[in-house]
Amino acid sequence: SGNLYEAISVSCNNQSTSVDSKIETEEELIKRALEIHKRVLTLDTHADTPLRMIEPGFDMAERHDPNETGSKVDYPRMKEGDLDAIFFAAFVAQDIRDDNGNSRAKALCVQMIDSIVNSTKKNSDIVGLALNPDDAYDLEKEGKRAIYIGIENGYPIGKDLSNVKLYYNKGVRYITLVHSSNNDLADSATDSKGPEHGGISYFGSKVVNEMNR
């Protein structure tokens, strides 16, 4: 691995290649792509793996057969694929928006976040929790995979702004405001009931400001 700039440079240089340049074969393209892949820092910005991590007996340090478990990511396959860093998303599907629903969503979200953190501690010889961009490069130099944490769907925030800080302190570094249905933060383009807030809600704007603080 190396620097993302190299991949960008290669891409830009290719755009200016003259039409009479040698056309690469598929084999040559794959070879060059693999060379770039090995040279740059590679990052997967979204994986729903935490849904697996809270299942009894699921171990991220073991290589899983996707045909048997449905698992698409684990630490051995991250190494095999030269994937340097990944965002594990704690996903909570949208449900009832009342105190009980918000409480259940928060509890499930915290459970997934804790499972990610515990997994990085248990496997600290091969992975590490990353909290900023530099951490990925530092962990790469140590021969470790960088594990970032995100939240998919702002539902676990409920109506409590202080939850943003709670999740941040636990290691979360991004939150997608909404998923397949409207919530208290914003409208979803796929909600069958149509828009509720006209986009982002007033509370959703406060959440964004808090995340950027």
Regions found by a protein language model. Give the residues of each.
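Sec-dependent bacterial lipoprotein signal peptides
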Residues: 1-7
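N-terminal hydrophobic targeting/anchoring segments and the immediately downstream early-domain regions
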Residues: 2, 12-198
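Alpha-helix-loop-beta-strand connector modules within alpha/beta enzyme cores
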Residues: 195-213
